[in-house]
Each structure stands twice: as C-alpha cells, then as structure tokens.
Amino acid sequence: MSMLCYTLIIAFLIGIWAAPKSEDNVPLGSPATSDLSDTSCAQTHKALKTSRNTDQRHPAPKKAEDQELGSAANIIVDPKLFQKRRFQSPRVLFSTQPPPLSRDEQSVEFLENEDALNRNIRSKRENHPVNDHGEYSVCDSVSVWVNKTTATDIKGKPVTVMVDVNLNNHVYKQYFFETKCKNPNPVPSGCRGIDSRHWNSYCTTTQSFVKALTKEGNQASWRFIRIDTACVCVISRKTGNF
C-alpha cells in the first residue's frame, strides 16, 4: 500500500514539472508577443495621426523674416496693362535701372525722391544759356527723373503711386520726367525780358496729367495724375498803367 502511495506521489510531481511555463517566459513570436507588438504599432499610428491633426489646427508661427518678405512682396502686374498705347507717356518710364540723364543727354539729373529734388535742384546747363541767335529763356527750368509715392489724380483725390512694379518676375521702377522752375525770379524784376515798368512778372511751375500705374489695396490700375511739366512766366499789368 505504501509503495502504491509513493508511486502516485512521484507521478504527480513529474506531471507538475513537465507542465508549460507561464506566459512571462513565452518565446518570441508567440501569440502573447504578437498581441503586444500590434498594440504598440496601433498606439504609435494613433499618436502620429493626432500630431498631424494638431499641426494642421495650430500651424507653427512663421519666422519674422518670412513675414517681412511677404509684406514687402510687390503686386504682380498683368502684362496686358502695358499693351495699350493710350496708356504710354514719354514722361513715364518703367526701368530696372536709373534712366539716362535725359532724352537728349542734356540738363537732366536723376534724383531718388522729391525731397532730394527740393534739396538739390541744379542744372547742367548755364544759368542763362545763349545760342547763336542771341535767344534767352524767359524762365530758368530744371528737368529731373523722380520716383513718386503719392500724387493727385484728375479728380483731385490723393492716390498711391506704385514705385516698384512686378512684371513677369522682374521688378521695374516707375520714373517720372518732371520739369520745374529753378527760380521764380531769374532777374530782380521777375521774368527775363519783361518790361518791369508796365508789367509785374514771375516764373511758376505748371502741371499736366500723365497716365501712371497706381494701386488701391492689392489692385494695380492706370490713373491720370498731376506732375510738374513746365515753367512759365505769369504777367499782370501794373496798376495805373493803361
């Protein structure tokens, strides 16, 4: 009897020793490990998707340089705006470089802006040019190329003039050929050659309208604007001289 009990106990212990080990020691590639790997991949995919959605809802702020570049971008102009001859004027020039001194290469300077024009008006001609026929100019004038940022249109309203024009990925500057009086009184009595005993006189700058490319918001369009184009003499009869 005791031999039978010992046999049963030994058989029971051998059966326990031969039983499978716990899942902690399951070899790689077993169902337990595959489930863990699939769960990890699913979590990673979910995290990436969430990150992309977050980036789309809250995009990263642009750099200051990019914002400045965007704000300074020129308005792109349709080349068709330049195809109509009625918009062309000999006093308006679009160029990538400063224009020549003048159309006849005489007595014209290039200045950066209107302030420079007012500070530094000078001419390459003599103050009182004399030709072979002994002809004199009643008023002395100076002609210059200028850039304008603002002007007055034909309706008397202020408009913004385009300085830089983006045309076919090339940036052109808009220049205006202006003529102004050099001095309101070229001689002490006023205009040169006027009989001061009977007439009051002085020189003044007159304006004309030219077509210029202007902008309103992000739109470019042609408008008539005033620019200085001539220097003339104005006379009036002195009181009592009839």
Curated annotation (Swiss-Prot):
Glycans are attached at N147. InterPro entries: Cystine-knot_cytokine (IPR029034), Nerve_growth_factor-like (IPR020408), Nerve_growth_factor-rel (IPR002072), Nerve_growth_factor_bsu (IPR020425), Nerve_growth_factor_CS (IPR019846), Venom_nerve_growth_factor (IPR020433). The keyword Electron transport does not apply. Residues 52-66 have a biased composition (Basic and acidic residues). GO terms for molecular function: growth factor activity; lipid binding; metalloendopeptidase inhibitor activity; nerve growth factor receptor binding; toxin activity. Disulfide bonds join C139-C203, C181-C231, C191-C233. This is Venom nerve growth factor 1. It comes from Demansia vestigiata (Lesser black whip snake).
